[in-house]
């Protein structure tokens, strides 16, 4: 670039900075240096953290989790909230469905005393509260449960049979236009839970769609499709569900990766079950018939017994997790560990 053009560009950049503040325009190399590695919040599932490619859900971004009823959508977000709190962060839950179970949330490791909860009356109120929490810059993760329950004020105040075509889609589109810049600026993770609906008269392709129009699909950096695969049984007793999450959109890493894990009733995602599956897959645990061994020592017969063994020996579970993370997520410690290291350095 010749000198005159350099001077003209420098003058323009100076004027933009004076008018709109420092950092309004910067060179991509500078932006990368300022931003560094993307900050993430763990999902509470080791397999899903690996499938996401960056070790968790990215902060400063919009994430959508959708799936059929009772597939584990709220469970997954409560685990993410618990992980954010473990790392010293603040979390908020906008409960538009008015269905949050505090006892279950506590069992998953959520600190109820520190969790901010809102049960708004209308969709506009829910999204306005979300925007105000984001703009405060003091909240690390905001969960909206769910998009389908964000009922526009006009619909609530109208009669039962009234037609309100496209109202919810317009509401979501307007809210996301306003929210995205604030989300990026405050480095807040905003998770929208969504439900599935069927499109009528679809001959080819999937008839499934999500509620609230197309805006959320465009604004989301990560979209995850969560499905229940089958029941986990002990005799006739059902202990939980086998669950699969497919990352259908990912702006942070290659998409379309899948994670399979177990959700146990009253306990949430089985961390030990994931360690067993990944340990066998990566050759850290040897499996011969029904027996599992680690470094030549037998640790149990059957997955259920090995799960109990790992619960009783947390040091072995921690060692396995470290080996798996070092192998599959090199250079990415879980957020709670990273936070602990930082506080140790500050001290």
UniProtKB/Swiss-Prot annotation:
Q: Can you cite an annotated GO cellular component? A: cytosol
Which parts of the sequence are annotated with region: Disordered?
Answer: 326-347
Disulfide-bonded cysteine pairs: these are none
Keyword ATP-binding appears in the UniProt entry: yes
Among the GO molecular function terms of this UniProt record, one is: ATP-dependent DNA damage sensor activity
The job of this chain, per UniProt, is described as: Can catalyze the hydrolysis of ATP in the presence of single-stranded DNA, the ATP-dependent uptake of single-stranded DNA by duplex DNA, and the ATP-dependent hybridization of homologous single-stranded DNAs. It interacts with LexA causing its activation and leading to its autocatalytic cleavage.
- Protein name listed in UniProt: Protein RecA
């Amino acid at each position: 670039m010749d000198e005159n053009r350099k001077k003209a560009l420098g003058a323009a950049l100076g004027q933009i900075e004076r008018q709109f503040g420092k950092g309004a325009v910067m060179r991509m190399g500078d932006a990368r240096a300022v931003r560094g590695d993307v900050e993430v919040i763990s999902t509470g599932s080791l397999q899903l953290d690996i499938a996401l490619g960056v070790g968790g859900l990215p902060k400063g971004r919009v994430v959508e989790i959708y799936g059929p009823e009772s597939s584990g959508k709220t469970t997954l977000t409560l685990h993410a909230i618990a992980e954010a709190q473990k790392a010293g962060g603040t979390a908020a839950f906008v409960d538009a469905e008015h269905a949050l179970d505090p006892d279950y949330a506590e069992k998953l490791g959520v600190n109820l005393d520190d969790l901010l909860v809102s049960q708004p009356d209308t969709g506009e109120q829910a999204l306005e509260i979300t925007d105000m929490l984001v703009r405060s810059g003091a909240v690390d993760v905001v969960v909206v449960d769910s998009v389908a329950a964000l009922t526009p004020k006009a619909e609530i105040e109208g009669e039962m049979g009234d037609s309100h075509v496209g109202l919810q889609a317009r509401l979501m589109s307007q809210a996301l236009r306003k929210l995205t810049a604030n989300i990026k600026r405050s480095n807040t993770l905003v998770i929208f839970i969504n439900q599935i609906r069927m499109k009528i008269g679809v001959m080819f392709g999937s008839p499934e769609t999500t509620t609230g129009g197309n805006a959320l699909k465009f604004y989301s950096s990560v979209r995850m499709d969560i499905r229940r695969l089958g029941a986990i049984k002990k005799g006739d007793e059902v202990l939980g569900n086998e669950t699969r999450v497919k990352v259908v959109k990912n702006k942070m890493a290659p998409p379309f990766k899948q994670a399979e894990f177990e959700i146990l009733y009253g306990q949430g995602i089985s961390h030990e079950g994931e360690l067993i599956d990944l340990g066998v897959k990566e050759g850290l645990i040897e499996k011969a018939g029904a027996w599992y061994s680690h470094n030549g020592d037998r640790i149990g017969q059957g997955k259920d017994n090995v799960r109990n063994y790992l619960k009783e020996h947390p040091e072995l579970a921690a060692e396995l997790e470290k080996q798996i993370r070092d192998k599959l997520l090199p250079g990415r410690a879980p957020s709670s560990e990273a936070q602990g290291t930082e506080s140790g350095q500050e001290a």
